[in-house]
Amino acid sequence: MASELAMTAELPTSPLAIEYVNDFDLMKFEVKKEPAEAERLCHRLPAGSLSSTPLSTPCSSVPSSPSFCAPSPGGQPSAGPTAAPLGSKPQLEELYWMSGYQHHLNPEALNLTPEDAVEALIGAPHHHHHHHQSYESFRPQPFGGEELPPAAHHHNAHHHHHHHHLRLEERFSDDQLVSMSVRELNRQLRGFSKEEVIRLKQNRRTLKNRGYAQSCRYKRVQQRHILENEKCQLQSQVEQLKQEVSRLAKERDLYKEKYEKLAARGFPREPSPPAAPKTTAADFFM
């Protein structure tokens, strides 16, 4: 009974705190019994801590609650500048120990009962961790003086280098590389790195060799077609000449045969005309 009176005497007198505490019906929850060692761990503050709120138990993930009980007899008061004096009432910030879970424990906003708020509070650490992971994905990109990890530097440099290569390779078409003179190409490549210039010139040399090989192949094919056409024309002319030779040979043989027949029979002699009678002068005067 004396302990209940002592606890009642040390309860906060602020109306806001009393109203905040009275919203919860905590009497229906069972009190977890813990060993004395766990109780000592609960009442011990970490080194350098400025808060008078004890730590939570090792077996529980529920955030630590404000301490309304009297200090242990063997405990020593904290020597920190902000520590509360021995036997003093809890500070006002201890009454708002659940301020980090306002989105869980706001019955007016979520239309929840106090029991639902306590259940949400019990599952709050895991939920907070889940939200922390989800918020990590929406972290803004670093600017200016913020440091980037080496992997991010390498990724950004590789992306910029690859984009630079694409711009250089897409700057000239194949026809421009082949038709452009060496002087003009060197003038266009000023300001680029040596590796990019060497790669582009190798590409230009490959294109020129490929074009030269295609030109030679085209010329060979064209020359072969010309020679094949001339061959066909000459073959047709030879056939025509052969036919003409055979015709002339036949005609020669025909004339030769006629000549031989005529020579074998002999040519007939034509009859001489009759001689005119001689007239004398005596016949003339007769």
Swiss-Prot record:
UniProt-listed GO biological process terms: insulin secretion; regulation of transcription by RNA polymerase II; response to glucose
Source species taxonomy: Eukaryota, Metazoa, Chordata, Craniata, Vertebrata
Top-level taxon of the source organism: Eukaryota
Region (Leucine-zipper): 227-248
Keyword Phosphoprotein: yes
Record protein name field: Transcription factor MafA
Residue numbers spanned by region Disordered: 51-87, 126-167, 265-286
Family: Belongs to the bZIP family. Maf subfamily.
PROSITE patterns to which the protein is assigned, alphabetical: BZIP
Phosphothreonine modifications at: T53, T57, T113
